[in-house]
């Protein structure tokens, strides 16, 4: 069976490294499904839930919360360089819930002061927190 090596790398080190038969990521243009022997690509990534179907483990699916970055696909090696990333099993849900509440509070506060930059920053923080919460439930 043809397979790909999938690595997710952050400034903190390698967060994921396994062989896969399928992965799904989200770019600014939408969702992208990747199978072995995919054409070489470099693309930006959105904050999203990355789905990985592993090789040799019947229907084993791993989920990784990706918080932006880029993907490079070359010669059956998929490398994702992300600002931050967490596997579903590693997510501290209570910390993510606190981040969600903090971001919601920051959005409300920034909207009352009409601070557009702070609203945008808080919305990104909210998207990241919600992404982590959603991935933790997979």
UniProtKB/Swiss-Prot annotation:
Compartments, as annotated in UniProt: Cell membrane
Top-rank taxon, per record: Bacteria
Function recorded in the entry: Produces ATP from ADP in the presence of a proton gradient across the membrane.
Family designation: Belongs to the ATPase epsilon chain family.
A cellular component term, taken from the record's GO annotations: plasma membrane
Protein name: ATP synthase epsilon chain
GO molecular function terms listed in the Swiss-Prot or TrEMBL record: ATP binding; proton-transporting ATP synthase activity, rotational mechanism
Classification via HAMAP family: ATP_synth_epsil_bac
Keyword list, A-Z: ATP synthesis, Cell membrane, CF(1), Hydrogen ion transport, Ion transport, Membrane, Transport
InterPro entries given in the database record: ATP_synth_F1_dsu/esu (IPR001469), ATP_synth_F1_dsu/esu_N (IPR020546), ATP_synth_F1_esu_C (IPR020547), ATPsynth_dsu/esu_N (IPR036771)
Protein source organism: Streptococcus equi subsp. zooepidemicus (strain MGCS10565)
Quaternary structure note: F-type ATPases have 2 components, CF(1) - the catalytic core - and CF(0) - the membrane proton channel. CF(1) has five subunits: alpha(3), beta(3), gamma(1), delta(1), epsilon(1). CF(0) has three main subunits: a, b and c.
SUPFAM superfamilies the UniProt entry points to: Epsilon subunit of F1F0-ATP synthase N-terminal domain
